Amino acid sequence: MKTQHIVHLSTYPADDIRIFQKACKSEVAEGYRVTQIVCHNSDETVDGVEIRSMPRSKRRLSRMIVLPWRMFRAATQQDGDIYQFHHPDLMLAGLLLKLSGKKVIYDTREFYPDKILSMRWIPAKLRPIASSAFALYERITSAAWDHVIVADRYSAKAFKGRPVSVVPNYPLLTPVEPTTVGKHKKHTLIYVGGLSAERGLLVMLKIAELLRDHNVELQLMGNCPFPEDEERIHAVPNVQYLGNQDLQGVYQHLGEADLGLLLLQPVPAYTYAGENTLKLFEYMWCGLPVVSSDFPNLRQIIESAQCGICIDPRDAERAAAAILRLLEEPELRQKMGTNGRNAILSAYNWPAASRVLSQIYQNVLSGKRSAVEPLPLWSVEPVDAAPCSTRVVA
């Protein structure tokens, strides 16, 4: 009997956590043959996943036209049973595969119509037009896909009436030693993720400055795409920039910190943050209390788990005061950290999310165009995004 073959098309790094570490490895464990077509240096097989390399496209237009065509041609050589593409840039490849009679899944981890409204490379006046145009394009093309996968309930609303399922961005249960309160003399705040004003970088730097005389340091991990932002980071003495880290490095540093920061700004791309926010769940898994933006979906998770506090992410002074109060209460921090880790073990983990993914594949292979029931949250009803603001703290 032929082993069923899942082929992933991705513009993300070959070792991407959501695609490679979670989805691909889970599929291999279930007995599928798994191939990932990705921009990479060479063909290789890693942990049972066949990686087929493509040359990188440096220009944006090339990524939207040339790269999808190349990936389509490479994909047709794989004889896959399911083709799953992971970025809107590859929609052309997905459409060509559908025209070739293939089963195709569109897997999007972000809500791009909102994200476009914060893209700096698009002139500000054109962003609303670009956002609306993309939303229409995404909606029309979604009729072609055998299934759509999103990372949260908010994004799923855009595909109402389509076979859409939520596969949350829950963490792998990688062995990790939970944070021990009082392990170090210095208090460490930590952030993992992209570094930009919209993601709270400037507020975090201001908080570090305000707490400099309280034996507090801030550690930042992740990509900093703008040189001017990296200069700002290096200008604050009690801030340590650790750059990009692999999963082991991330967990090692999280295990040595005191508080995890998640101060996304109230711009359209982030106000719906919740079950799609991996860093939140990584903090919880490592036993870190969370200091989060007070957005409804984040509050829903954090308050139900009693694993942190939610604050106004634009007010650095009040945030610093709230953080200082937490640092002065080690027993409360220990309790919050334990609560967060227990919530991960009980509900918010990748083994649970992978069961949804497994059912999606079964549906697609059997020709069923129906959604898979989302995993339950700890509250009864999901909530809508918070009101958006164009103001980002400077």
What kind of feature is each model-predicted range?
Residues 25, 68-76, 92, 96-100, ...:
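Membrane-proximal helix-turn-helix segments that form the acceptor-binding/catalytic region
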Residues 260-262, 282-285, 289-292:
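Short hydrophobic beta-strand element within catalytic cores of glycosyltransferases
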Residues 228-259:
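Nucleotide-activated donor-binding/catalytic signature segment of Leloir-type glycosyltransferases, i.e.
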Residues 41-42, 192, 217-230:
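Glycosyltransferase donor-sugar binding loop
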Residues 52, 134-178:
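Donor nucleotide-sugar binding/catalytic pocket of nucleotide-sugar-dependent glycosyltransferases
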Residues 304-305, 309-316, 325-331:
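Conserved acidic donor-binding segment of nucleotide-sugar-dependent glycosyltransferases
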Residues 318, 325, 332-347, 359:
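A short, well-ordered alpha-helix in the C-terminal region of glycosyltransferases
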Residues 7-9, 149, 171, 180-208, ...:
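Conserved donor-binding/catalytic core segment of Leloir-type glycosyltransferases
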